[in-house]
Amino acid sequence: MYKRQKEYSVYGINDFVICAGYKQYMIKEWFNNYFLNTSDVTFDMTDGNKVILHEQHSEPWRVTVVDTGENTMTGGRIKRIQKYIGNETFCMTYGDGVCDVDISEIIKFHRSHGKLATLTSVLLDQSKGVLNIGGDNAVQSFREKSKEDSAPINAGYMVLEPEIFDYLDGDECIFEQAPLEKLAEEGQLMSYRHRGFWQCMDTMREKIQLENLWSHGKAPWKVW
C-alpha cells in the first residue's frame, strides 16, 4: 500500500482513498502512528510524559481510509467511496500487482479520448480479464479469462470518470464483470497499452520472486 502511494505520488497524485475491509483498523493505526514509527523519538518522562519526534519524515499525502466491509465485492467497494470522490476524474488500482507504467501517460491518454473509463492492458498469460481491443484502442468486449485464452489482460491501472458510479449497484457488484462489460458494449471503455514490466502477486512463488527483485535493488516498478 505504501509503495503504491509512493508510485502515484511521483506523478503528482497525493490524495488517496483506500477501500479497506479485512483488518481495516490496522491500516488506520499504521497511518495514525506514521510519524512515531518513522522518526527518532524521545520520551521525556520528567516533563509530563512529553514525546519529542526528531527529524520527522512526511509525505505530501491526504489519505482517507474507508471501511468498505469485509465481504464487499470490488464494484461495491468503489460505490461506497463515491462521496469521497465527488465529481472528479479519478485513478483506481488494486494492491496485488506491480508495474513500471507511466501513470501520467495513462491520464493523458484518458483525457484524449473523452470516454468514461480507461484501463491499462498488458500481454501476459495470466488468469485476468480478457480484452478484445480494436485498432482505435477501444475495448470492444471485456470478460473474465479462461485457461484457453492468450490475449491482452487488464493490468489494474485505471482512470475513471465519476459517471461510472451509475454502473455500480450494491455490495455484490463485481466491477470486473457487468460494469466493465457494459462500458465496453457502450464504447465507453478504452485501453492504454503498456509493453513494459508488469507482474501480479497471487501466489507464494510470485511473492518470493518480487521480494527478491526488491531486496537486490532490481525492482522495475520502483520509480521513486
Where are the language model's segments positioned?
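Conserved N-terminal catalytic core of the sugar/cofactor nucleotidyltransferase
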Residues: K3-Y94, E105, T203
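Residues at the starts of beta-strands that form the adenosine-phosphate
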Residues: N14-F16, L116-A117, Q188
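Short beta-strand/turn micro-motifs composed of small residues
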Residues: A20, S121-V122
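Residue-level signal for inorganic ion chemistry
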Residues: I27, I81, D96, H110, ...
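Conserved beta-strand termini and adjacent loop/short-helix elements that scaffold enzyme active sites
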Residues: T46, V66-T68, T120, Y192-H194, ...
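Acidic/His-rich active-site region of diverse nucleotide-sugar glycosyltransferases
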Residues: T72-M73, V130-F142
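Catalytic-core segments of class I nucleotidyltransferases/pyrophosphorylases
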Residues: T89-C91, V98, D102-R111, L123-Q126, ...
